[in-house]
UniProtKB/Swiss-Prot annotation:
It comes from the Bacteria. The lineage of its organism: Bacteria, Pseudomonadati, Pseudomonadota, Betaproteobacteria, Burkholderiales. It is found in: Cytoplasm. NCBIfam families: argG, PRK05370.1. Pathway: Amino-acid biosynthesis; L-arginine biosynthesis; L-arginine from L-ornithine and carbamoyl phosphate: step 2/3. It comes from Polaromonas sp. (strain JS666 / ATCC BAA-500). Homotetramer. PROSITE patterns: ARGININOSUCCIN_SYN_1 (PS00564), ARGININOSUCCIN_SYN_2 (PS00565). This is Argininosuccinate synthase.
Length: 446
């Protein structure tokens, strides 16, 4: 049986991930008129630009849905977001500024929870608004089939009949107006936005051109910190972690992770923290460009990484970061629940995050400009007395100890010099020209 349907399955239940926007509204009504039985499912992901979630299912019913459900995905999204933070599952960075994979995290939650809700209604055909050029078509495909092995996929934007009849936003708006819904297109923006409570993604249209910078974006989770007229005051923030879990902000304890993330968003958003401009490789290897917001995750990640570096040794940190980059790619590719991702994630949560207990105080300024003011943890292995430049009693090692340690280094120094001489004689290194120690040109080996 074909997994992907190229034509509308008339007379059958078809689930649609319904946002209430023009595209999914027109698609739902069109499917109804063509004889399908559309079921609408809307994910509440805490989108910062969504004013009224309850209105969305009501719209779906007006447009012809047999049933419309609002699925609260916020707790699951918060849990997955913290898991990503604990494992450092972020592989896209530019000059140290991070993209926190907020859209891939949202897709992992949406793809599994909506398809699970569809199964409850005996709906085994799923459609959504992703296009064939993007990442989401593959992410939703994977998560959908992982959740329901009997799932078949119908996407209006892969159906030539739909494209011929409603191929653009103007056509879809006219279609809805003629149907009596008086649907008005929103003002055309210079870019497209997708968001959840973890972060926002701005891309496409004018942002496809690299000479259009971040300044054309109107942030939805924080301030436009680059504008001189926007007042941004310095602010000190204290973040507390217990066994890898963020639990308090400025001394206020949160038992609900969703509420903590929302408060972190408010704090970070006042400064424009966590905004980044990234060029990335999509799953199909073509490059795309996005402007991202993630004020809350950025704040939490600053504190988390500070504690990680103060608590764990160098090899553990190296493994955490290497595995985090691998895990970030898997998350981006729609493989967050694959065995190899679970292995990497749970390793970090068990052996890195569980030791992360403490408080970090940060001074936030404009954008990603901040200073760490204090770090406190019962688990710190940072011991200033070990390396103090002042005279201390009961020093952990003496000058004689260091002489012995340095003398042992002679073994590998000699071996390294021999190897460099071999490379020089073989013509792999040019003696004295900066590629190797200049004194090798006087080496007497023949």
């Amino acid at each position: 049986m074909a997994t992907i349907l190229q034509n509308l399955p008339a007379g059958q239940k078809v689930g649609i991930a319904f946002s209430g926007g023009l595209d999914t509204s027109a698609a739902l009504h069109w499917m109804k008129l063509k004889g399908a039985l559309p079921y609408a499912y809307t994910a509440n992901l805490g989108q910062p630009d969504e004013p009224d979630y309850d209105e969305i299912p009501r719209k779906a019913l007006q447009y012809g849905a047999e049933k419309a459900r609002l699925i609260d995905c916020r707790s699951q999204l918060a849990a997955e977001g913290i898991a990503a933070l604990q494992s450092g599952a972020f592989h896209i960075t530019t000059a140290g500024v991070t993209y926190f994979n907020t859209t891939p995290l949202g897709r992992a939650v949406t793809g599994t929870m909506l398809v699970s809700a569809m199964k409850d209604d005996d709906v085994n055909i799923w459609g959504d608004g992703s296009t064939f050029k993007g990442n989401d078509i593959e992410r939703f495909y994977r998560y959908g089939l992982l959740t329901n092995p009997n799932l078949r996929i119908y996407k209006p934007w892969l159906d030539q009949l739909f494209i011929d009849e409603l191929g653009g936003r103007a056509e879809m708006s006219a279609f809805m107006t003629q149907a009596g819904f008086g649907y008005k297109m929103s003002a055309e923006k210079a870019y497209s936005t997708d968001s959840n409570m973890l972060g926002a993604t701005h891309e496409a249209k004018d942002l496809e051109h690299l000479n259009s910078g971040m300044k054309i974006v109107n942030p939805i989770m924080g301030v436009a910190f680059w504008k001189d007229e926007v007042e941004v005051k310095r602010e000190e923030v204290t973040v507390r972690f217990e066994e890898g879990q963020p639990v308090a902000l400025n001394g206020k304890t949160f038992s609900n992770t969703v509420e903590l993330i929302l408060e972190a968003n408010r704090i970070g958003g006042r400064h424009g923290l966590g905004m980044s401009d990234q060029i990335e490789n999509r799953i199909i290897e073509a490059k795309s460009r996005g402007i991202y917001e993630a004020p809350g995750l950025a704040l939490l990640f600053i504190a988390y990484e500070r504690l990680v570096t103060g608590i764990h040794n160098e090899d553990t940190i190296e493994q955490y970061r290497d595995n985090g980059r691998r895990l970030g790619r898997l998350l981006y590719q729609g493989r967050w629940f694959d065995p190899q991702a679970i292995m990497l994630r749970e390793t970090a949560q068990r052996w890195v995050a569980r030791a992360v207990t403490g408080e970090v105080t940060v001074e936030l300024r404009r954008g990603n400009d901040y200073s760490i003011l204090n770090t406190v943890s019962p688990n710190l292995t940072y011991k200033p007395e070990r390396l103090s430049m002042e005279k201390v009693e009961d020093a952990p090692f003496s000058p004689l100890d260091r002489i012995g340690q340095l003398t042992m280094r002679n073994l590998d120094i000699v071996d390294t010099r021999d190897k460099l001489a071999i490379y020089t004689q073989a013509g792999l290194l040019s003696a004295g020209q900066g590629a190797s120690p200049p004194q090798l040109k006087n080496d007497e080996r023949k």
